Amino acid sequence: MKDVTIIGGGPSGLYASFYAGLRDMSVRLIDVQSELGGKMRIYPEKIIWDIGGIAPKPCHEILKDTIKQGLYFKPEVHLNERVVDIRKKAERHFEVETEAGEIYTSKAVIIAIGAGIINPKQLDVKGVERYQLTNLHYVVQSYRRFKDKDVLISGGGNTALDWAHDIAKIAKSVTVVYRKEDVTGHEAMKTLVTDLNVKLCPKTRIKYLVGNDDETHISEVVLEHVESGDTHTVKFDDVIISHGFDRCNTLLSETSSKLDMHDDCRVKGFGNTTTSIPGIYACGDIVYHDAKSHLIASAFSDGANAANLAKTYIQPDANAEGYVSSHHEVFKEANKTIVNKHLY
């Protein structure tokens, strides 16, 4: 039996993992995705400005450090596992069950599932799956791959316009198609992309994808006007889909442990990350409490708070907070390496 099971491997879950390890707890970390990072993996190239003391840098760099930190105390990690139930068997005895039927036990549970399981909405076009490993994209991992390319973006929201704006600076051309008469993203961003000669095509959708000879890459796209039905075919090097996300948050509605909720979509926190069930804590975007702000920095704070509360639940005579890292014995040897690197 572990001390704590953390459900969700985004920034809050990862920091909870680190802080629980710092507090000498054994940790199990479960995530439904194949990689840790949560929603931060959706926008790896976006620049993050609002983490205190951290210079602005691409999200993927912050994510790399966050994962490294979250794994510092060697938690037991389970990826590609969807949690379907949380059961409180007794005080300091919880069962966490996965879709595959695995049952994990721990003395406390921290829920850090963000807005739930998030997956990009798929393009509803026949044969689309054959191109997903080549030049059809649902997430932009790197802008550099689009240098000097003809790029098509489907979608008219903020994410689509953000991608269009950034990619247009290095691509040969960028075309944005969307079903409505106007984009739904910020008006200021529309002006910016227009100034960069991004071609905006309202009331237009992707009708067909035309592959190359071996059907491994998209070579042409058939575009259709949604009102007239008129079509035309255009050559593109890459196609990006930005149609929003499918969200699944059935864990909280179906779990045996019925938690008090806020607006039916977030766990109600009582002053902090405490929930209505002793021994279960919630951190990050999934929890609502009076001091809540939806920032990565706040997710870190929530994670530490949840870990501290789990510690005192498991061990009532423990200190309410952990010892500051600058004077913590657990980092003594690691600090020597860091000091030598920076001072000598």
Swiss-Prot record:
Cofactor(s) required for function per UniProt: FAD
Q: Which GO terms describe its molecular function?
A: ferredoxin-NADP+ reductase activity; flavin adenine dinucleotide binding; NADP binding
Pfam families membership: Pyr_redox_2
Extract the InterPro entries matched here: FAD/NAD-bd_sf, FAD/NAD-binding_dom, Fd--NADP_Rdtase_type_2, Ferredoxin-NADP_redctase_2
Q: Which domain of life is it from?
A: Bacteria
Q: Where does the chain bind FAD?
A: 12, 31, 39, 43, 83, 118, 285, 326
What's its EC? 1.18.1.2
Cite the HAMAP family for this sequence.
FENR2
Return the similarity comment: Belongs to the ferredoxin--NADP reductase type 2 family.
* Protein name per Swiss-Prot or TrEMBL: Ferredoxin--NADP reductase
Annotated source species: Staphylococcus aureus (strain bovine RF122 / ET3-1)
Give the organism's phylogenetic lineage: Bacteria, Bacillati, Bacillota, Bacilli, Bacillales
